Swiss-Prot record:
Catalytic reaction equation(s): di-trans,octa-cis-undecaprenyl diphosphate + H2O = di-trans,octa-cis-undecaprenyl phosphate + phosphate + H(+)
Listed transmembrane segments: 54-74, 90-110, 116-136, 156-178, 190-210, 222-242, 252-272
EC number: 3.6.1.27
Organism whose genome encodes this protein: Salmonella paratyphi A (strain AKU_12601)
Protein encoded by which gene: uppP
Stored HAMAP family: Undec_diphosphatase
Record bears the keyword Cell wall biogenesis/degradation: yes
Subcellular location: Cell inner membrane
GO BP annotations, alphabetical order: cell wall organization; peptidoglycan biosynthetic process; regulation of cell shape; response to antibiotic
Predominant location: membrane
Protein name: Undecaprenyl-diphosphatase
UniProt lineage: Bacteria, Pseudomonadati, Pseudomonadota, Gammaproteobacteria, Enterobacterales
Gene Ontology cellular-component terms listed: plasma membrane
Amino acid sequence: MSDMHSLLIAAILGVVEGLTEFLPVSSTGHMIIVGHLLGFEGDTAKTFEVVIQLGSILAVVVMFWRQLFGLIGIHFGRPLQREGESKGRLTLIHILLGMIPAVVLGLVFHDTIKSLFNPINVMYALVVGGLLLIAAECLKPKEPRAPGLDDMTYRQAFMIGCFQCLALWPGFSRSGATISGGMLMGVSRYAASEFSFLLAVPMMMGATVLDLYKSWSFLTAADIPMFAVGFVTAFVVALIAIKTFLQLIKRISFIPFAIYRFVVAAAVYVVFF
C-alpha cells in the first residue's frame, strides 16, 4: 500500500469514525462496511480503529472539559446558561452508576461478546437499535422528569447504565442505547445525550486502552503517519459532529436516525451477503 493511498484511507476512516462514534447510528456498522469496501481489514486495521477512537474520545474531553472537571470537584466560572442546556451539576457517583452494569457484564462475557463481532450480528443490532430509538420517542414521558443533567437521579443514571449493556452487542450503538434508555427513564433528549457523551469518556477510554495494549504488537513505525492522520481527522470531525448533533436534537426527534440505521443494515446485507 503506497504512502498516499494509506493516508487517504486513514483520512476516510477518520471521517467515518468521527461522524458516527457519538451519533446513535453505530460506528461499528459503518466501519466494517467502509473498511471492507476499501480493502482495509485484518490486525493492522483493528489496531487503527482503536487509535482513531482515541481521537473521538479526545473530542468529548475538549467539548465537556468543564463538566468533567466538575465531577472531581474542580469548578470553573460558567458562562450564561442557554435555554435547554444543563447546568452541569453532575456527580462522579452518577457516572459510576452508569458504568457498573456494562463493565461487569463486559468482563464476565468478554469472549462471548467478541464472538458476536460479525456482519450478520451487526446487521441485526442496527435494526433492533433503530426500533429502540423509535420506542424511546413514542414511549417517553410528555414532560421529562429530568430536563437537565442537574435533575438526574442516581436511579436514572443506573438504569441508563443497564441500557448501555445493549451496546455490548456489536452494531447496537452505545450512544443509541444510552440516549434511548435515558429518554425512557424520563430524562430529556438533550440531557440524555449529554450524559451519554460524558459516560463515553471513562467507558471508551478504558476499553480502548485495553484493546490498544493487546494490539500493540501490530503497530509499526511505518504505520505512525497513517495512524496520526486518522487520529487527527477523527478528533476534528467528532468535535464538529458533537456540536452539530447537540444543536440538531433540539429541533428534531431520533426517528430520522432510526430510519438511517435501517438503511445501513440493508447496506451491510448487500455488501456482505
